[in-house]
């Protein structure tokens, strides 16, 4: 089925997974130290019809933050996505999508616990200078955490995802990538392995991205949970949003 003819995000995801050349993508993923870029995983028409309106609809809910020398931008947490932008969950919770990811990373992946605000969240670059400095998506779980990023809106020539592959590899030479994530483009990586940043947004530009997180073990120690919550409240979603849900039962799904 052509994605342009689908009636729902779920149908589009199922169709997209079926059309992937898995063997080629698997080789690329492992050859690039657990990093993969898939242009147009979902078509622009599907993204702009079903997903972009929901991302634009929760702009008023975003929490803006500024950490001098590291980060400036806005974020909408998983909790708001659940309540006000549920179409994103049709992708995040898709069994076909999770099965594909599990095969790709060669590990059984689960959704993050329901009290993780990063599980399925939106990131907004809407003001000049919005950016994030180089970092890893470090896993505080008792296992690996994988980040999947999808472009939603990219009206920018300056705001790019910058990746440094093999940064800590003692044998291979580093590989520098600069990516513009168009609507429907997908980036998959092991959070502990990819050193990455987003360059500053220019005047009159806009960039919105969806980020989804999956884990091999949804358990997290008490101290690491507290540290993770503090970091998320300061750098992303705000104290009220994070700690309102911090001790809510996980109600895990897999």
Regions found by a protein language model. Give the residues of each.
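Catalytic core of non-heme Fe(II) oxygenases with the double-stranded beta-helix
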Residues: 89, 99-193, 205-209, 216-225
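Non-heme Fe(II)/2-oxoglutarate
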Residues: 2-9, 13-104, 200-254
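Amphipathic alpha-helical surface "interface" segments used
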Residues: 72-77, 122-123, 230-235
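Soluble, non-transmembrane catalytic domains of enzymes that act on hydrophobic metabolites at membranes
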Residues: 61-62, 176, 192-199
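A general structural signal for short secondary-structure boundary/capping elements
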Residues: 82-86, 166-170, 193-198, 211, ...
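Generic structural "secondary-structure junction" signal
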Residues: 32, 78, 83-84, 93, ...
């Amino acid at each position: 089925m052509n994605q342009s003819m689908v009636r729902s995000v779920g149908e589009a995801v199922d169709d997209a997974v079926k059309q992937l050349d898995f063997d080629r993508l698997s080789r690329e993923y492992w050859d690039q130290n657990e990093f993969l870029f898939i242009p147009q995983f979902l078509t622009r028409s599907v993204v702009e019809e079903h997903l972009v309106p929901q991302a634009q609809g929760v702009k008023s809910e975003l929490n803006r933050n500024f950490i001098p020398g590291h980060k400036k931008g806005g974020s909408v947490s998983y909790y708001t996505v659940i309540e006000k932008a549920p179409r994103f969950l049709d992708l995040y919770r898709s069994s076909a999508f999770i099965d594909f990811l599990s095969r790709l990373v060669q590990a059984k992946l689960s959704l993050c616990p329901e009290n993780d605000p990063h599980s399925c969240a939106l990131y907004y670059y809407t003001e000049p200078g919005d950016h994030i400095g180089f970092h890893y998506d470090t896993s505080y779980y008792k296992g690996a955490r994988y980040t999947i990023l999808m472009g939603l809106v990219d009206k920018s020539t300056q705001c790019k995802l910058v990746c440094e592959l093999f940064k800590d590899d003692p044998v291979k030479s580093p590989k520098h990538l600069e990516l513009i994530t168009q609507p429907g483009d997908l980036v998959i990586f092991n959070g502990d392995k990819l050193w990455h940043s987003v360059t500053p947004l220019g005047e009159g530009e806009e960039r919105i991205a969806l980020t989804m997180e999956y884990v091999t073990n949804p358990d997290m120690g008490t101290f690491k949970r507290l540290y993770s919550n503090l970091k998320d409240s300061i750098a992303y979603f705000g104290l009220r949003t994070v700690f309102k849900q911090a001790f809510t039962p996980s109600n895990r799904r897999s």
